[in-house]
């Protein structure tokens, strides 16, 4: 009886990769069914993730410069997650926004609702955030046309 030493999975893959005449067949699999398979080609993102600028918290979308002069802003509009909007914030205005909602086009900061106090159609900013706070920027997780899974892995 021949006694062969076992080869690790890692070494088997190295050996197979180095065989020039070895022709690997490619198949399409769902990611959750691809355990222990090798990726035949780079997988490239077709979209940005997130696909648009959105709020990371419930609160108020603002123009950060507005709160340097006045901590109280007018509000009468709101944006919820799933709303497909193209709003712009006016000077001195805040827009009520919810987690995952698309940011107004020119807004650059979201104030967490816990740091505000409302009275009628006015919102008082109790704690001013830094510019860009509580915003998820389009493509910050994955940029369109970038490799997300590399061939051979």
Segments predicted by a language model, with ranges:
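Short, glycine/charged-enriched hinge/interface segments at domain edges or termini
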Residues: 2-3, 60-153
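Short, low-complexity N-terminal leaders and the immediately following helix N-cap/first helix
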Residues: 1-69, 121
């Amino acid at each position: 009886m021949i006694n062969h030493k076992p080869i690790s999975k890692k070494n088997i893959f190295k050996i197979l990769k180095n065989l020039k005449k070895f022709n690997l067949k490619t198949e399409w699999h769902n990611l959750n069914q691809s355990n222990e398979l090798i990726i035949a080609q780079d997988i490239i993102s077709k979209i940005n993730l997130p696909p648009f600028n959105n709020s990371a918290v419930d609160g108020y979308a603002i123009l950060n410069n507005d709160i340097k002069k006045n901590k109280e802003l007018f509000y009468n509009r709101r944006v919820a997650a799933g709303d497909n909007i193209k709003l712009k914030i006016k000077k001195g205005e805040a827009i009520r926004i919810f987690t995952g909602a698309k940011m107004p086009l020119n807004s650059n900061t979201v104030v967490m609702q816990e740091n505000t106090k409302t009275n009628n159609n006015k919102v008082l900013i109790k704690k001013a955030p830094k510019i860009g706070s509580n915003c998820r920027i389009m493509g910050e997780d994955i940029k369109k046309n970038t490799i997300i899974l590399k061939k051979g892995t």
